[in-house]
């Protein structure tokens, strides 16, 4: 599995780029405190070559960190399942790293999976780094409603997140299970999120 970019443009693709104020040099923000961004730059010519070779070699394409334009380049120029390894629902949290409902449907429609991200700034309605299990459950419910029972897995991003974390590390994952149960997820839905959906994609692709 490989993502085509991180937080900066490279020779393959671009992320959503924060828009800077011409006067102050700072990043412009919306009313919820999220950075405004330019989503228009997608894959480069080399990026299009890479995704073709990745599919030929059986590699899984990861669209987390890609710009919106890059996401739709993947949709239009590939045929196999792809993943968003650590992204949430933009409808519930306006951060540019999250997926719109149309994106969630596109991942699900291709048979891919989205990894639920535990970072507070990707979970909350405002730019707040406090990571709460209740917000994880809310994003999970929304993504299942939009994309169906097969679209969601786990993408905690423990190695890259900070802030006040209700789940500190993988030894505390039972807190997520209990939170999903409190939010009335079924046992089958929870099993799908914990491992079945991701394993399905791996077995199909690898």
Label for each model-derived stretch:
Residues 5-9, 59, 64-69, 87-90, ...:
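Active-site beta-loop-alpha junctions enriched in small/polar residues
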Residues 12-14, 92-99:
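Short, charged, surface-exposed secondary-structure boundary motifs
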Residues 18-83, 96-110, 134-150:
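Histidine/acidic residue-rich metal-binding segments in metalloenzymes
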Residues 61, 86, 114, 157, ...:
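Conserved, mostly hydrophobic/aromatic
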Residues 108, 113-123, 127:
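A conserved active-site cap/scaffold subdomain adjacent to cofactor or substrate pockets
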Residues 117-118, 147-170:
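Short acidic/histidine-rich active-site segments
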Residues 168-206:
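Mid-to-C-terminal alpha-helical segments outside catalytic/metal-binding sites
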